Curated annotation (Swiss-Prot):
Belongs to the protein kinase superfamily. ADCK protein kinase family. Its EC number is 2.7.-.-. Residues 195-533 form the Protein kinase domain. The lineage of its organism: Eukaryota, Viridiplantae, Streptophyta, Embryophyta, Tracheophyta. Residues 1-58 form a transit peptide. It comes from the Eukaryota. This is Uncharacterized aarF domain-containing protein kinase At5g05200, chloroplastic. One of its GO terms (molecular function) is ATP binding. The keyword Plastid applies. Keywords: ATP-binding, Chloroplast, Kinase, Nucleotide-binding, Plastid, Transferase, Transit peptide. GO terms for cellular component: chloroplast; plasma membrane; plastoglobule. ATP binds at residues 201-209, 224. It comes from Arabidopsis thaliana (Mouse-ear cress).
Amino acid sequence: MAVSAFRGTRLPLFHHSQFPVARTVSGTSKKMIGARNFKGFVLTAQYSQTQDLFTSRLQSQIEKLPKLVEDIVQTSINTGPRGVTRLVQGVQAFVGVGGEWLNDLSKSTSASGGLPSELQLGLLSPLYLRKLFERMGATYIKLGQFIASAPTLFPPEYVKEFQNCFDKAPPVPFEEIRKILQEELGRPIESVYEYVDPTPIASASIAQVHGARLRGSQEDVVIKVLKPGIEDFLVADLNFIYVVSRIFEFLSPEFSRTSLVGIVKDIRESMLEEVDFNKEAQNIESFKRYLETMGLTGQATAPRVYKYCSSRRVLTMERLYGVPLTDLDSIRSLVSSPENSLITALNVWFGSLLACESFHADVHAGNLWLLRDGRIGFLDFGIVGRISPKTWAAMEVFLASIATEEYESMASALIQMGATNRDVDGKAFAKDLEKMFSSIQELDTEIVVATARGTNSDTTAVAANVVMDERQMNALFLDLVRVSESYGLKFPREFALLLKQLLYFDRYTRLLAPNLNMLQDQRISIASNKRTNGYKDSFN
């Protein structure tokens, strides 16, 4: 093919007028020879450049191959026989969901109309991939939740679908939990606990929680226990995902440019931290130190960790009693001003962004309570975030811009926060942000009011609760990511975590303090790089 192109004249891209005719010392004939052969010379040079580029890339891949093989071998050794077990389970899950897809496909082809996109994509479609993840169990459910909470990293169709990846699982029989407790404690559980309630308070994919009472001190506690086999499955699954990502990056440079392995490492680190209860205990202790250092122990708390009966698979914590920040009637029975309680929660959380090693990154109503003694209780530190001063500096400007509706400043802050390799039109970006943020007002919080008459009296209790639509909240993330990506911006995951917590607080504000502007009220002190010791004044 190259020879015929060299000989022919069917290459209109190469015009003689674009190039100087070769100079010669003597004779017109030599000039003509130079001109006649120039077309072939240019094509040969371009072919040579392409060949050099291919050779260079091939050489680069060959140099990377030993490292890839080493990673695969080492990962396989670390995985061990449990990898075979998970492979069999994976095949079973694949066959099950594949059969479901084929059944849906046959129904769709027999009906009139075109084939839906989720059927065209097969098991790679968001719908069937989510179903496959759920069949694969705990690791993949957690992975699905990671996808749902990271609109800055994944396509919107997958983020939306994985909102349905619920972390609910049937409880493990108590005899298995008892066995784990005895193994981890190294002695009969009766020597540590006066009793353990065999009925779990909660059960999720990786752990379940039981109420208990300590022997001797008679203190009420909760025990969080990692379910049996979770660690083996988790290591095997994460190692498999890592190997696949390494192979993809090796085969296609495109995956390398999208930092696929980096994303997988982030997922692996996040998930391994969540199943290491020693790490969660450290997160709790860090938060409690922050409260003590800032003099906030009278305003907020976190559960005490009982280290002598805790381990990597078991976490024994003080049992706190209170109500979620969404239970308005109960809050009113505990404090005279729900608004002040909310302001306290906001100040404590904002202060932790810079004054604590990590911030609580899951402040939904189940994890943020008003306790019986009037303090704010922060629960469940399995998911935390860490933010760099540089990112938070941009976030400060972003939040201030939201409050003042200065969209050019907002655009500037997002450009500073995001990673991009091209120039961004700040004014056009600001106009798009203004259109998008007008939709926030449409994210109405539903306040449900219920009345109940007492059985032995004529009194009537009125309870108000706020209902927050997670899909609406994530729709806002996706809109922001969509607009930003159109300008080539990519944000760190911490940005999505921060924004989600702020939206939780926005919903609490609508219920507990409708007239409060949490970004402008002088009683609320937003963390600043310029100060980390000014939060005490916010509580006086």
